[in-house]
Protein backbone atom coordinates (compact mmCIF):
# COMPACT_ATOMS: atom_id res chain seq x y z
CA UNK A 1 0.00 0.00 0.00
CA UNK A 2 2.85 2.31 0.86
CA UNK A 3 4.49 1.79 -2.54
CA UNK A 4 1.18 2.48 -4.31
CA UNK A 5 0.76 5.73 -2.37
CA UNK A 6 4.33 6.76 -3.13
CA UNK A 7 3.76 6.05 -6.83
CA UNK A 8 0.53 8.08 -6.79
CA UNK A 9 2.17 11.06 -5.14
CA UNK A 10 5.16 10.86 -7.47
CA UNK A 11 2.85 10.99 -10.50
CA UNK A 12 0.83 13.85 -8.96
CA UNK A 13 3.98 15.82 -8.19
CA UNK A 14 5.20 15.31 -11.73
CA UNK A 15 1.84 16.53 -13.06
CA UNK A 16 2.04 19.65 -10.91
CA UNK A 17 5.62 20.27 -12.07
CA UNK A 18 4.62 20.02 -15.73
CA UNK A 19 1.68 22.36 -15.17
CA UNK A 20 3.95 24.83 -13.36
CA UNK A 21 6.43 24.80 -16.22
CA UNK A 22 3.64 25.32 -18.76
CA UNK A 23 2.33 28.31 -16.84
CA UNK A 24 5.85 29.70 -16.39
CA UNK A 25 6.76 29.36 -20.05
CA UNK A 26 3.44 30.06 -21.76
CA UNK A 27 1.19 31.72 -19.19
CA UNK A 28 2.51 35.21 -19.83
CA UNK A 29 1.99 35.03 -23.57
CA UNK A 30 -1.10 36.56 -25.09
CA UNK A 31 -2.13 34.89 -28.34
CA UNK A 32 -4.90 36.44 -30.43
CA UNK A 33 -7.80 34.26 -31.55
CA UNK A 34 -9.06 36.80 -34.10
CA UNK A 35 -7.79 39.77 -36.08
CA UNK A 36 -10.25 42.65 -35.75
CA UNK A 37 -11.61 43.75 -39.10
CA UNK A 38 -10.07 40.81 -40.97
CA UNK A 39 -11.98 37.84 -42.34
CA UNK A 40 -10.25 34.48 -42.17
CA UNK A 41 -10.54 31.85 -44.91
CA UNK A 42 -10.32 28.33 -43.50
CA UNK A 43 -9.38 25.48 -45.83
CA UNK A 44 -8.85 21.75 -45.45
CA UNK A 45 -5.48 20.95 -47.00
CA UNK A 46 -5.13 17.31 -46.00
CA UNK A 47 -7.00 14.32 -44.61
CA UNK A 48 -4.75 11.56 -43.30
CA UNK A 49 -5.50 8.63 -40.97
CA UNK A 50 -8.96 10.12 -40.31
CA UNK A 51 -7.36 13.41 -39.23
CA UNK A 52 -8.57 16.55 -40.99
CA UNK A 53 -5.88 19.23 -41.18
CA UNK A 54 -6.72 22.85 -41.86
CA UNK A 55 -5.04 26.14 -42.62
CA UNK A 56 -6.25 29.69 -42.12
CA UNK A 57 -5.56 32.44 -44.66
CA UNK A 58 -5.69 36.22 -44.46
CA UNK A 59 -5.59 38.44 -47.52
CA UNK A 60 -4.49 42.02 -48.18
CA UNK A 61 -7.12 44.74 -48.16
CA UNK A 62 -8.56 45.64 -51.56
CA UNK A 63 -7.62 42.26 -52.99
CA UNK A 64 -7.37 42.43 -56.77
CA UNK A 65 -8.98 39.58 -58.68
CA UNK A 66 -6.12 38.63 -60.99
CA UNK A 67 -3.16 39.72 -58.88
CA UNK A 68 -0.65 37.38 -57.22
CA UNK A 69 0.73 38.37 -53.83
CA UNK A 70 3.85 37.47 -51.83
CA UNK A 71 2.88 34.91 -49.20
CA UNK A 72 4.17 34.03 -45.73
CA UNK A 73 3.31 30.68 -44.12
CA UNK A 74 3.51 30.34 -40.33
CA UNK A 75 3.99 27.13 -38.32
CA UNK A 76 3.43 27.31 -34.57
CA UNK A 77 5.80 25.87 -31.98
CA UNK A 78 5.24 23.32 -29.25
CA UNK A 79 7.94 20.67 -29.54
CA UNK A 80 5.87 18.73 -32.11
CA UNK A 81 3.76 17.83 -29.05
CA UNK A 82 1.14 20.60 -29.04
CA UNK A 83 0.55 24.24 -29.88
CA UNK A 84 -1.99 26.36 -31.69
CA UNK A 85 -2.24 28.44 -34.86
CA UNK A 86 -3.03 31.43 -32.64
CA UNK A 87 0.70 31.82 -31.87
CA UNK A 88 1.43 33.78 -35.06
CA UNK A 89 -1.98 35.31 -35.66
CA UNK A 90 -0.78 38.82 -34.76
CA UNK A 91 2.13 38.54 -37.19
CA UNK A 92 -0.23 37.16 -39.83
CA UNK A 93 -2.57 40.11 -39.40
CA UNK A 94 0.25 42.60 -39.63
CA UNK A 95 1.81 41.17 -42.79
CA UNK A 96 -1.61 40.91 -44.44
CA UNK A 97 -1.92 44.64 -43.78
CA UNK A 98 1.44 45.05 -45.54
CA UNK A 99 0.13 43.43 -48.71
CA UNK A 100 0.90 39.74 -48.26
CA UNK A 101 -1.25 36.64 -48.21
CA UNK A 102 -0.64 35.10 -44.78
CA UNK A 103 -1.23 31.48 -43.78
CA UNK A 104 -1.50 29.75 -40.40
CA UNK A 105 -1.01 25.99 -40.71
CA UNK A 106 -2.26 23.33 -38.31
CA UNK A 107 -0.43 20.00 -38.35
CA UNK A 108 -0.25 16.71 -36.48
CA UNK A 109 1.27 16.81 -32.99
CA UNK A 110 1.81 14.12 -30.39
CA UNK A 111 -0.79 15.29 -27.84
CA UNK A 112 -3.65 15.35 -30.34
CA UNK A 113 -2.67 12.77 -32.92
CA UNK A 114 -0.09 10.48 -31.32
CA UNK A 115 2.33 11.51 -34.05
CA UNK A 116 6.10 11.98 -34.30
CA UNK A 117 8.11 14.91 -35.69
CA UNK A 118 8.28 13.03 -38.98
CA UNK A 119 4.50 13.30 -39.44
CA UNK A 120 4.69 17.00 -38.55
CA UNK A 121 7.25 17.54 -41.31
CA UNK A 122 5.12 15.61 -43.79
CA UNK A 123 2.16 17.86 -42.97
CA UNK A 124 4.23 21.03 -43.29
CA UNK A 125 5.34 19.95 -46.74
CA UNK A 126 1.81 18.92 -47.74
CA UNK A 127 0.62 22.42 -46.81
CA UNK A 128 3.16 24.06 -49.12
CA UNK A 129 2.19 21.73 -51.95
CA UNK A 130 -1.48 22.55 -51.41
CA UNK A 131 -0.78 26.28 -51.54
CA UNK A 132 1.27 25.91 -54.72
CA UNK A 133 -1.33 23.70 -56.38
CA UNK A 134 -4.07 26.24 -55.58
CA UNK A 135 -1.90 29.32 -55.99
CA UNK A 136 -4.03 30.94 -58.69
CA UNK A 137 -7.32 30.85 -56.79
CA UNK A 138 -5.59 31.89 -53.55
CA UNK A 139 -3.74 34.83 -55.16
CA UNK A 140 -0.36 33.38 -54.22
CA UNK A 141 2.86 34.28 -55.99
CA UNK A 142 4.73 30.97 -55.96
CA UNK A 143 8.02 32.78 -56.61
CA UNK A 144 7.62 34.84 -53.45
CA UNK A 145 6.71 32.33 -50.75
CA UNK A 146 8.18 32.65 -47.26
CA UNK A 147 8.09 29.91 -44.62
CA UNK A 148 8.26 30.94 -40.98
CA UNK A 149 7.75 29.51 -37.52
CA UNK A 150 8.90 29.35 -33.94
CA UNK A 151 10.82 26.58 -32.19
CA UNK A 152 9.48 23.27 -33.60
CA UNK A 153 7.44 25.35 -36.05
CA UNK A 154 10.65 26.97 -37.23
CA UNK A 155 12.01 23.47 -37.73
CA UNK A 156 9.07 22.77 -40.03
CA UNK A 157 9.66 26.00 -41.94
CA UNK A 158 13.31 25.10 -42.49
CA UNK A 159 12.31 21.53 -43.32
CA UNK A 160 10.05 22.49 -46.22
CA UNK A 161 12.87 24.52 -47.71
CA UNK A 162 15.81 22.20 -47.12
CA UNK A 163 14.77 18.56 -46.69
CA UNK A 164 14.59 16.49 -49.89
CA UNK A 165 12.79 13.60 -48.19
CA UNK A 166 10.16 13.03 -45.47
CA UNK A 167 7.15 13.31 -47.77
CA UNK A 168 3.61 12.03 -47.35
CA UNK A 169 3.10 8.93 -49.52
CA UNK A 170 -0.06 10.44 -51.01
CA UNK A 171 1.56 13.79 -51.90
CA UNK A 172 2.25 14.78 -55.48
CA UNK A 173 6.02 15.05 -55.09
CA UNK A 174 6.34 16.60 -58.54
CA UNK A 175 5.31 19.78 -56.68
CA UNK A 176 8.40 20.83 -54.77
CA UNK A 177 8.21 22.46 -51.35
CA UNK A 178 10.98 24.98 -51.85
CA UNK A 179 10.30 28.53 -50.69
CA UNK A 180 12.08 31.75 -51.53
CA UNK A 181 12.87 32.88 -47.97
CA UNK A 182 12.82 31.73 -44.34
CA UNK A 183 12.08 33.61 -41.13
CA UNK A 184 13.08 31.45 -38.17
CA UNK A 185 12.11 32.38 -34.60
CA UNK A 186 14.29 30.55 -32.00
CA UNK A 187 14.01 27.57 -34.30
CA UNK A 188 15.07 23.98 -33.92
CA UNK A 189 17.43 23.42 -36.83
CA UNK A 190 19.87 20.83 -35.46
CA UNK A 191 18.69 17.33 -34.58
CA UNK A 192 22.17 15.83 -34.54
CA UNK A 193 23.98 14.06 -31.69
CA UNK A 194 26.17 17.04 -30.72
CA UNK A 195 25.69 19.51 -27.84
CA UNK A 196 23.42 21.74 -29.96
CA UNK A 197 21.28 18.89 -31.22
CA UNK A 198 17.63 19.03 -30.13
CA UNK A 199 15.89 15.77 -29.17
CA UNK A 200 18.34 13.70 -31.18
CA UNK A 201 17.22 10.47 -29.53
CA UNK A 202 13.64 11.12 -30.55
CA UNK A 203 14.64 11.41 -34.21
CA UNK A 204 16.43 8.07 -34.19
CA UNK A 205 18.95 6.78 -36.70
CA UNK A 206 17.30 8.68 -39.56
CA UNK A 207 18.04 12.08 -37.96
CA UNK A 208 20.01 13.24 -41.01
CA UNK A 209 16.81 13.11 -43.06
CA UNK A 210 14.98 15.49 -40.71
CA UNK A 211 17.72 17.82 -39.40
CA UNK A 212 17.66 21.06 -41.45
CA UNK A 213 21.18 22.18 -40.60
CA UNK A 214 22.58 18.95 -42.05
CA UNK A 215 20.77 19.58 -45.35
CA UNK A 216 21.93 23.11 -46.18
CA UNK A 217 23.11 23.11 -49.78
CA UNK A 218 23.79 25.63 -52.52
CA UNK A 219 20.57 27.44 -53.33
CA UNK A 220 19.30 27.52 -49.74
CA UNK A 221 16.90 30.49 -49.45
CA UNK A 222 17.80 33.77 -47.71
CA UNK A 223 17.10 33.42 -44.02
CA UNK A 224 16.53 35.55 -40.93
CA UNK A 225 17.24 33.75 -37.64
CA UNK A 226 15.88 35.43 -34.49
CA UNK A 227 17.07 34.22 -31.08
CA UNK A 228 17.49 35.33 -27.47
CA UNK A 229 20.84 34.77 -25.78
CA UNK A 230 19.07 33.30 -22.72
CA UNK A 231 17.16 30.68 -24.69
CA UNK A 232 17.26 27.47 -22.63
CA UNK A 233 16.48 25.26 -25.63
CA UNK A 234 18.36 26.73 -28.59
CA UNK A 235 21.97 27.82 -27.91
CA UNK A 236 23.36 30.83 -29.77
CA UNK A 237 26.06 28.49 -31.09
CA UNK A 238 23.38 26.71 -33.16
CA UNK A 239 22.40 29.95 -34.91
CA UNK A 240 26.08 30.72 -35.49
CA UNK A 241 26.63 27.26 -36.98
CA UNK A 242 23.58 27.67 -39.21
CA UNK A 243 24.91 30.99 -40.51
CA UNK A 244 28.37 29.54 -41.09
CA UNK A 245 26.92 26.73 -43.19
CA UNK A 246 24.75 29.19 -45.13
CA UNK A 247 27.78 31.41 -45.75
CA UNK A 248 29.71 28.38 -46.99
CA UNK A 249 27.15 27.71 -49.74
CA UNK A 250 26.80 31.38 -50.65
CA UNK A 251 23.35 31.96 -49.17
CA UNK A 252 22.26 35.00 -47.20
CA UNK A 253 21.64 34.51 -43.48
CA UNK A 254 20.97 37.26 -40.96
CA UNK A 255 21.19 36.27 -37.30
CA UNK A 256 19.63 38.62 -34.74
CA UNK A 257 20.52 37.88 -31.11
CA UNK A 258 18.55 39.67 -28.38
CA UNK A 259 20.31 40.14 -25.07
CA UNK A 260 18.62 38.76 -21.99
CA UNK A 261 15.74 37.17 -23.90
CA UNK A 262 14.55 33.59 -23.56
CA UNK A 263 12.52 31.16 -25.61
CA UNK A 264 9.41 32.64 -27.22
CA UNK A 265 10.30 36.25 -26.36
CA UNK A 266 8.96 37.51 -29.71
CA UNK A 267 5.31 36.85 -28.83
CA UNK A 268 3.00 39.49 -27.39
CA UNK A 269 2.80 39.14 -23.60
CA UNK A 270 0.15 40.23 -21.15
CA UNK A 271 2.35 43.05 -19.87
CA UNK A 272 4.23 44.11 -23.01
CA UNK A 273 4.41 43.85 -26.78
CA UNK A 274 7.93 45.31 -26.94
CA UNK A 275 9.74 42.38 -28.53
CA UNK A 276 6.83 41.48 -30.77
CA UNK A 277 7.10 45.01 -32.16
CA UNK A 278 10.90 44.95 -32.42
CA UNK A 279 11.14 41.56 -34.12
CA UNK A 280 8.20 42.21 -36.45
CA UNK A 281 9.84 45.43 -37.65
CA UNK A 282 13.05 43.51 -38.37
CA UNK A 283 11.16 40.86 -40.33
CA UNK A 284 9.39 43.65 -42.21
CA UNK A 285 12.72 45.19 -43.21
CA UNK A 286 14.07 41.77 -44.23
CA UNK A 287 11.06 41.08 -46.47
CA UNK A 288 11.27 44.61 -47.86
CA UNK A 289 14.91 44.01 -48.78
CA UNK A 290 13.74 41.00 -50.82
CA UNK A 291 11.17 43.14 -52.63
CA UNK A 292 8.15 41.40 -51.11
CA UNK A 293 6.73 44.48 -49.36
CA UNK A 294 7.33 48.19 -49.80
CA UNK A 295 7.95 51.17 -47.56
CA UNK A 296 8.78 51.46 -43.88
CA UNK A 297 7.26 49.22 -41.19
CA UNK A 298 3.84 50.46 -40.12
CA UNK A 299 3.92 49.46 -36.46
Segments predicted by a language model, with ranges:
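Short beta-strand element of the alpha/beta-hydrolase
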Residues: 67-77
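Primarily recognizes the serine-hydrolase "nucleophile elbow" in alpha/beta-hydrolase
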Residues: 126-198, 207-208, 212
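Alpha/beta-hydrolase active-site loop
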Residues: 115-136, 278-282
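C-terminal catalytic histidine-bearing segment of alpha/beta-hydrolase fold enzymes
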Residues: 56, 240, 247-299
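Short amphipathic alpha-helix adjacent to the substrate-entry channel of hydrolases
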Residues: 85-104
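N-terminal cap/lid segment of alpha/beta-hydrolase-fold proteins
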Residues: 29-67
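Conserved alpha/beta-hydrolase "acid-adjacent" motif
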Residues: 232-238
Amino acid sequence: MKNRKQNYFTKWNMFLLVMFLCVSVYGQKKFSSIIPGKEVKELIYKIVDADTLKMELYFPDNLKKNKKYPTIVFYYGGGWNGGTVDQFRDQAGYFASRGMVTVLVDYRVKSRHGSTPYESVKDAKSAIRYLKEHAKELHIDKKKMVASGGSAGGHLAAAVALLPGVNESTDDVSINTKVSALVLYNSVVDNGPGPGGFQHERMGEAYLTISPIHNIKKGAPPTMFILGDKDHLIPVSVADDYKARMDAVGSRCEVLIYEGQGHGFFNIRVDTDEYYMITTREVDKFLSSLGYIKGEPTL
